[in-house]
Every structure is written in structure tokens, then in C-alpha cells.
Amino acid sequence: MHNGSNGSVEQRDSMPETSREWWPGSLDVEILDQNAQDVGPWNGDFDYAEAFQELDYEALKEDIEEVMTTSKDWWPADYGHYGPLFIRMSWHAAGTYRTTDGRGGSSGGRQRLAPLNSWPDNANLDKARRLLWPVKQKYGRKISWADLLVLAGNVAMESMGFETFGFAGGREDDFKPDESIDWGPEDEMETWGRFNEEDELDNPLGATVMGLIYVNPEGPESTPDPEWSAQRIRKSFGRMAMNDRETAALIAGGHTFGKVHGADTDEHLQAEPEAAPIEQQGLGWHNEHGSGKGGDTITSGIEGPWTDAPTEWDMGYLDFLLDYEWEVHKGPGGAWQWRPKSDELKGVVPDAHDASETVDPMMLTTDVALKRDPDYREIIEDFRENPDAFEDAFARAWFKLLHRDMGPKERYLGPEVPEEDLIWQDPVPDADHDLIGDEEIAELKEAILETDLSVSRLVKTAWASASTYRDSDKRGGANGARIRLEPHRNWEANEPPQLAHALEVLTGIQKNFNDARTDDVRVSLADLIVLGGSAAIEKAAADAGHDVEVPFTPGRTDATQEQTDVEAFEYLEPKADGFRNYIADDPWQDWTPEEFLVDKADLLNLTPAETTVLVGGMRALDATHEQADGYGVFTDRPETLNNDYFVNLLDMGHEWDPVSEDKQHFKIRDRDTGEVKWKATRVDLIFGSNSRFRALSQVYGSGDAEEKFVDDFVDAWTKVMNLDRFDLE
């Protein structure tokens, strides 16, 4: 950028400005920097959970409702009530979640940051957030934007007569976009290059169109085809962890409120917030049609309300949709929408801004899809026959939508947390016994090391248990010992036969220990699996000449199969794990192995340095997958914690030759003799090829670095083992 003499900002469109732009094919290690950097203003001395508990929660809700019912001239409320606008804001804040990789969702308050703040589907939600600013300003850091954006939708529903299922706070704010999220391959908004010839949606995406939360309301590819739309709805909502019943409840319940806005075509709209002139102060979509607000508002390009009481909870949406026939036409905004064929619904809805006028209701293609698709239709007909069941289904689905990315219930804050445990929260039981102490820990370590389980097997078992964790939605991890349950125990990445033996041995130790106790001290299998990894690492370090103690904190418990949603956990199956040098035959994404490694490291909340030291340590411990067949184990001293991996990788006495045209596997040869010394994968060689990883490898491969390597490995290992220990925060 160059500042012109007139004070304007000139954009450079073609000249590369960053290393990534100069070399776009290089591995994007930078996404791991966000796990090391705190770009917020609190300097690490702020505990949001503690601040939230000091909040006058009921006063906050009252203030939100007052804002909601006090129309402002600069952005007049439809029907005198901002409730429907706030519901849309909350829905779109949470609705970016996708279950494939757990990314997106309401955490972080990312709707106020690029790119989400400028997505076309979020048009005019900048006004909703500005309306809430006085509330945020009043309560300061006691309420995050992330919590406020979704709480506002709950309060909106309650103010319009709906009883919600509850609400939990605890979402902290981000102050920069999450660069790890793949929003799609397109380079233009409202395009759909994410489908293949079989109409299958790319992984890990949930939305079907760039810049939209779910699907195109006009229909797929702006085609008003309800049957095709139903297919897209099912795919998109399914990727966001919703089944058919939850999906139908969300659409029917959400569309009970408010209206859509398309007073004219979008040619009257100026730039979105990120591209708007500086004097607009972060507001976008300046509208030059009429007054640019109120009845002249342009948002989606579709115009009209769904029901005759847009600010009341009732059965109007289902009654109108099911009782009347609807025909497609283009509305005043130039978009496809549906109008009633019958004259009975002519003018039955008060105008949103002029009480002397009336308008007709409308439906979206996505609404008509619920009526045309036989499975959805059966559900919505049942909802209409059973209003209480509909209300309960919507309340539960709405709660799930808002909280799906928050992880287990123990992270929930506030007085409205529901008592009921829900299976999608991945519940684990409370400990009903006393925990093991130092004496018992030492006894159990000794018992573990006396078995036939090798250092490698113990490390791999602990890693397989803990590394399912995803920091994106706080799911997975060692707590619960779900590695012994379906589906985890049969995942190829976990080497099922060997895992079964390890679990059998560890379960035997657990039983013998617990049966022998005459007090209330017991050990869970979840703790014992992690402790086995600790014991193995301590032995491996000792065998390399280092005396270390791996920190261990008991307190994990064992979940049951009944507490485990098998289908939901399938998404946590590792299709690639560079730490174990593993990649499935059918990985869900067309990435290179090193890209999978960085993605996995990011989900584990690891920094570049932690990623580097963990890979080197896992190789030294011979903790690679059996599929790897020794690839990456650059040491003559396997199962000892040494830095040979880095020493041999960086040795210029070696050269690296691909063994196949696809350059997935390599042989490391002695330059002078041609002798093959080691075998490597792309994941291994990236630590010598990528400049950032090489710089870190050189630290750990130095002559004086072995002690630092061991200490850093233990620290990074302990971090992974405790990622899901929210009780320790």
C-alpha cells in the first residue's frame, strides 16, 4: 500500500508483499503462529471465566432486551423490534461451525472480523453489532463479543414468547482472524466451485456457497428447485452436526420470526465493511436506494415476511407453508422467491415500517424444500400436529447450534446452563473415588514397565488416546478413555490388534490395583493410559542418559459406550497423523502429507517449535505407525529419547533421493558410498526443506541441544496429554 497525497489508500493488486505471496507453493507454517501469539490486549493476565462470573447476568439480559425494543432512526427496527435481526446475527455467528474439522462456530466472536464481517450472507449484521455496542461498552470485559453475539439471539427469542433451552457463556474473543480455517477454493463471493461432478461437497466445508452460511436461499446455483435444495440442505446441515429433525426444527423455528430484505436489486449497495471507505468506520453495504434503511433495506435481495406475526412465537410458519400452495417468481430484489397462489394470504401481514400498509407473506426455496422432500415433510407435519414437540425440538437444536463448538459441559458458565447432559457434549462421568498420589503413581509406573509393553507401544497408545483432541471445538482427548470404545478402538491409525493387547494389559493393571485397595483410591484407565506414556518416556530418557520426570496430573475418568455418539466421533478419526508418520489410503482431503501435519498440529494447538520437537521425539521413540515401516526413525538407538533425528536429517554427508515419481517416500544415502542410511517420508524431509522448520531443527540438532530437546519434548508431550483437562485451567 502507498499513501497518496490526497490521503486516500491505493491498493496494490498484483505485487507480492509477503513470502507466501512470493512463494505460494511453500508450506504454510504461519498458521501455527496463532497458537504462540497472544494478539489481544490483555497481556496474559486476564481470566475471562472469572470476569464472567462477576457479571450481573439478569441486568445484562434486561439491557439487551431494552436495546432490542428501542428503535433507532439510523437503522429502524422492523416491526419496532430488533429481535429477528439479533436472531440472524446469532445464527450466523454460530452457523459457520462444521463437524468435519470442528472449525468455525461462535467462539472467538469472529463475525466481527474479516472475512466473516464482509460475507454477503452477513450483510447488515454490522448494524446489529453496532446496536449492541452500548451494552458491550457498559459491561466491558465481563462479557465477550463472542458470548454477547449469541446471547442476544436467545434474549430475542425469549422477548418474543419462546422458551429457550438455556445458555452458557465462556467464549473468549479473538482479535485476529483464524487463518487455519479453509473457507473454500473460490476467489469470488457467492460462487460454488466446491462441488465435484457427482455434486459432492469438498471436505472439510459445510457451507455450499462461498460467503453464505449454509445454502443459497434461492436454491442451488440460484435455481429455484426445492428438491435439489433439500439435498443441499441435508448435506450442509449434516456437515454442521445436525440431523434431519434438528435441521427442520431450526429452519421452521428460525423462520417463524422476522423477514428478509430485498426492496430493490443489490446494484444500489456499496462495498462491504472491509472494503468500505474509512469514513464509514467499519460499516458496509451503504444503500443508495431510497432512504437506504427501513422499507428500503436491501440485504439478501429477497423481500418479505414468513408469517403474519413476525415478532411472536407461534405456529404461523408451518401453517402457512403446509396449508397453502406457493409459486415461484422474482421479487423486487431480482431474486427467486415464492408467493402464495391463494388470495387468502393477500395483505395479511402488517408492513414492517408503515402500520397503514400490508404485505403478502413469502417463502424461500429452502422453505418449500421442507414441504417437497418426503422426509422433511413428515417431520414438519409431525411438528404441526405436536406443537410442544416442535418447541422442544427447536429449543434443543438452537441450543446445540449455539454451543456445538464449546466442547464439554464443564466449560459452560452462567446461571442458565441446563442440568441435562446431552450426548453431543461428549460427557464423561465425575470421579467417584479418591485420586492416586505420588506413591501410587510410582507403584503403577513400575507395574507398567514390568509388562511386555514396549516403550514404543506405550507411547503410541497414550498418543492415540490424547491426540484425538481438536482445539477447534474442544472435542476428543484422553479423558474418557474412549480409545477402548467404538469407534476409536478400530481406527486404522491406532493399529487395532496391537492397541487391543495394550488395553488388555493396562486394564489388568488397573483391575489388580483397584481390587487391592482397602481405601477409596482408584485409578481410571484414562489416567493409566497417559501414565503409561509418561513411564515410557522417562525410561527412554534415562536410557539416553537423562533423568527426567514427566508431569502427570490424575483426574481423568472413563466414559461408557452409551455416553459416546459413534457417528459424531467418526469425524475425529485421524486420516493422517504426521507425528506417527501415518496417512490413510483415502484421506478426506487432497493435501500433501506435510499439509496434513500442519493441520493436525494446529488442531492440537501446537506452535512450530512444539511441532518440531514432538516429531523428532516420536521418531526417536520409534513411535511411528506400522505402515511407516521404519520411515523417519533416523537413529541406531530407537526407543531412547535422543536428538538423532535432527542430527542425521541435517547431516550434509547425506543426500535424499525419491523412490517414486510422486515423491512421497525417500531414501537417505551416504554421499560418498551411496549406502542407504535411512528411509524418510515427505513429513520427515519437510523439517530440512522448509526454512522455518529447518531453523528449528538446527536448534535441536546442535551439539549442545540434547538436554533442551528432552526438556522441550516433555513439555510439548505433557501439553498434548492435558489438552482436554479443562479442570486444570
Swiss-Prot record:
Record: active site: 92 (proton acceptor)
PTM comment: Formation of the three residue Trp-Tyr-Met cross-link is important for the catalase, but not the peroxidase activity of the enzyme.
Residues under site feature: Transition state stabilizer: 88
Enzyme class: oxidoreductase
Catalyzed reactions per annotation: H2O2 + AH2 = A + 2 H2O; 2 H2O2 = O2 + 2 H2O
SUPFAM superfamilies xrefs: Heme-dependent peroxidases (SSF48113)
One GO biological process term: cellular response to hydrogen peroxide
Cross-link (Tryptophyl-tyrosyl-methioninium (Trp-Tyr) (with M-240)): 91-214
Record keyword rRNA-binding present: no
Pfam entry (one): peroxidase
Cofactor: heme b
Biased composition (Basic and acidic residues): 10-20
EC number: 1.11.1.21
GO MF terms, alphabetically ordered: catalase activity; heme binding; metal ion binding
PANTHER family referenced in this protein's UniProt entry, alphabetically: CATALASE-PEROXIDASE, HYDROPEROXIDASE I, BIFUNCTIONAL CATALASE-PEROXIDASE
Family assignment from sequence similarity: Belongs to the peroxidase family. Peroxidase/catalase subfamily.
Function according to Swiss-Prot or TrEMBL: Bifunctional enzyme with both catalase and broad-spectrum peroxidase activity.
HAMAP family (alphabetical): Catal_peroxid
NCBIfam families: cat_per_HPI, PRK15061.1
SUBUNIT field: Homodimer or homotetramer.
Name used for this protein in its record: Catalase-peroxidase
Organism: Salinibacter ruber (strain DSM 13855 / M31)
Highest classification ranks of the organism: Bacteria, Pseudomonadati, Rhodothermota, Rhodothermia, Rhodothermales
Gene that this polypeptide is encoded by: katG
